[in-house]
Amino acid sequence: WIMGHMVNGIDQIDEFLRLGSNSPEFDINFDKDAKPVYTYHGVPCDCFRSCLRWEYIGDYLTALREVTTPGNPKFRENLSLFVFDLKTNSLYDSQAGKAGENLADDIFKYYWNEGNNGGRAYMIISIPDIEHYDLMTSFKHYFISNGHEELLDFVGFDFSANDNIPDVEKVFEKVRVPGVPDRVWQSDGITNCIMRGLNRVKEAVKVRDAGGIINKVYVWTVDKVPSIKAALDAGVDGVMTNHPDVVVGVLREDGYKDKFRYASYNDNPWETFKAE
């Protein structure tokens, strides 16, 4: 998966898709009542990017629904996965559960159109604080209690703060909901302004390949060819980047084109493929 980084403007969705992204990532900000309000990153952000693009969440999720609903004039077949980068650090730990419920309500209303011919894409809910695990639990229970447990088949989760992998595993085990399979992506990374090694990525890949709780691994934010190749060599499933076209170019090179391919909608984002 080629994850387009910081796609916070509606017009940027098509821009990043044209560049080769099949998985836009966007930032979700919450108000003091734990209600998601708008897409926005703010300063500082990645080098050489505008940090100030934003949209109201209802408008943004509606736009995503349009480009992922077959039959809609705006439908784009190659868009298969979203990454919700939640900005919950402004919330108290005690508000995490309410934030999850409110987010689920907005996704159900604006993206899944209240269960009536909504969008078809998968999504990763990426949480920046491991102590905000109640967000995940309440998100799941929202759909179960409203009779739409089947929609959880399209949802996976990630903790994005580069926590120790064993700590992440313990939290996912703690919040398991009976009857709802674990669907876990593990991210690792840092802003493109700073270099970061791949030791933790390799640890996450090892857990994935050993049949652990991690299904997929992605790295962020990598823009340069050597960094992209190093991440692919480490066995990641996704690369988050400001330059999807650069990743597309790497995937076409000898040594990569036979080992990796561009993910389509028919590829299950919860299915584990081991590094070889």
From Swiss-Prot:
Residues that coordinate or bind Mg(2+): E25, D27, D85
Q: Which GO terms describe its biological process?
A: killing of cells of another organism; lipid catabolic process
Describe, from its UniProt entry, the tissues in which this protein is expressed: Expressed by the venom gland.
Q: Which GO terms describe its cellular component?
A: extracellular region
Write down the EC number.
4.6.1.-
Q: Which protein family is named in the record? A: Belongs to the arthropod phospholipase D family. Class II subfamily.
Chain's role: Dermonecrotic toxins cleave the phosphodiester linkage between the phosphate and headgroup of certain phospholipids (sphingolipid and lysolipid substrates), forming an alcohol (often choline) and a cyclic phosphate. This toxin acts on sphingomyelin (SM). It may also act on ceramide phosphoethanolamine (CPE), lysophosphatidylcholine (LPC) and lysophosphatidylethanolamine (LPE), but not on lysophosphatidylserine (LPS), and lysophosphatidylglycerol (LPG). It acts by transphosphatidylation, releasing exclusively cyclic phosphate products as second products.
Q: Please report the name of this protein according to its UniProt entry.
A: Dermonecrotic toxin LvSicTox-alphaII1
